[in-house]
Amino acid sequence: MDVSRTEVRQAAAGAAPRRGSAVRLGLTVVPVAFFAVFFAYPVTAIVVRGLRVDGAWRIERLWQVAAGSDVRHVLWFTTWQAAASTALTLLVALPGAYVFARFAFPGKQVLRAVVTVPFVLPTVVVGSAFLALVGRGGLLDDLWGVRLDTTVWAILLAHVFFNYAVVVRTVGGLWAQLDPGQEEAARMLGASRFAAWRTVTLPALAPAVAAAALMVFLFTFTSFGVVQILGGPTFSTLEVEIYRQTSQLFDLSAAAVLTLLQFAAVGAILAVHARTVRRREGALRLVDAAGTARRPRGAGQWALLGGVLATVGVLLVLPLAVLVQRSLAVPGLGSYRALGSDAGGVFLVPPIDAIGNSLEYAAAATAIAVLVGGLAATALTRRDAGRLLRTFDALLMLPLGVSAVTVGFGFLIALDEPPLDLRTSWILVPLAQALVGVPFVVRIMLPVLRAVDVRLREAAAVLGASPWRVWREVDLPLVRRALLIAAGFAFAVSLGEFGATVFLARPDNPTLPVAVARLLGRPGAVNYGQAMALSTILMLVCAAALLVLERLRGGEGTGEF
């Protein structure tokens, strides 16, 4: 029987989507295995160790701990401060999102990098900077006798400092791609400026605002370093309480219960976040972001720009400037020179070695995060992914919300026997850092991959190209910039990871955040000066990496960050 060429092509075209679906499912094997071994297994090991004693389960500890008044108070404060921090961050950052989306002004790329620096700094550095600003003997204390340390206001301000970039990049990135002509058309039909914004722009932005708010709530709900340093013994979040129960009281059963409570809360937050992300990816009329920014016109727009710049200067730049000033307090760059020797006996090596260690660890973590995150993003490319893949997408975000203290301690407990006896291996630190980097890689690459015209892939497959060749010759050229940006962001985040690394970094191989924390934990002006110097170096490295990302990004919106 003769078969026409057209029938062959139709058969190939029908087989291509089925083959693509099988390949996408196959791509999930590596990410699933990675998260199962290096995330689910260590966290489960901590929970099991805490709730299983002498071979018997102590389920009653769940109710004993959860019903305690102290835990209820911690849970209430954790939720309350997260909600207040989220509301305050949105109030302060949404005008900034508009300015970065719609205004063109000199130094915009540099300023965008500057506002992102706090997001990737370790909390111990930020806590130290705010102590120098609002604590005893700080700038505000010297000038006006005002102290905010050990108050909830210091915690809230530091959370806004951290999460300002989340709102600016998530909401501003979409805002820059909305067609301003739609709002202008509404005004031509007689709508006021506010009515046009409320009926046209706000509905389009609502999913992005909701997604940003949920991410800010997640980050502040799991806050650790900021609350521990600025809140003192008065305030405690679930994360701080887990750390206290684990490392100070050695009550693993209480820590396990608190971890489960946090896990349940984070799971609910991420489920809602996944739904808002899908809504955000609905049909919108998007345009090139580079064509929507204009020079401010009129007194109102110039005043708005000035107000945003003033806010950035006071809230974001001033704490960083105080950090630099404290590092230069010793004449002749004395604090920086002291990094070459460990006169205080804090380390087995000079503190300056932490710079090289951090760069090496971050490079390895970036490679792992890009590989795992890239495979995961490719597997999630289809918009009409089934429930299994949608669940997988949500689970990829879990490392951002589950206690880093639990993960780090879980590594030490779970990965201690063959075939995964890694306790003495240097790879533990990059693995822990990569867990935090993978979600950012996915969130940056996924929207770009979904924007690739599926017909290009299908045409290449019909012509006989293998899935690997389709990805190499169709997807890769189109997503190369997003891939580089994802790698850079993973690198910056890995540099600042502290919660898990503090458990895993060996004394002879400290990272910059761990070195800063150890120096701050020792008395003396020399140790404090070295801590400020290392913090400044870390800040400058992160700023340089983010500035390169902004150069790569140009005027285009790339993913969610």
Q: What are the roles of these predicted feature ranges?
A:
Residues R18-R24, Q64-D70, F221-G267, A271, ...:
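Interhelical loop and adjacent transmembrane-helix boundary motif
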Residues D2-A45, Q109-V115, Q262-F263, G267-A271, ...:
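N-terminal signal-anchor/first transmembrane alpha helix
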Residues V30-F34, A87, V117, L121, ...:
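Transmembrane alpha-helices
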Residues L25, A33-R72, T79-A82, A87, ...:
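Short membrane-interfacial helix/loop motifs at transmembrane-helix boundaries
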Residues P17-R19, W76, P106-V110, W153-A154, ...:
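Amphipathic cytosolic juxtamembrane alpha-helices at the membrane-cytosol interface
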Residues A11-P17, I59-E60, Q64, R72, ...:
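Membrane-interfacial helix termini and adjacent extracytoplasmic/periplasmic loops
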Residues A84-V115, S128, Q182, A196-T201, ...:
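Transmembrane-helix boundary motif in ABC transporter permease subunits
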Residues D2-A12, A22, L27, G107-K108, ...:
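C-terminal transmembrane helix and the adjacent membrane-cytosol boundary/short C-terminal tail
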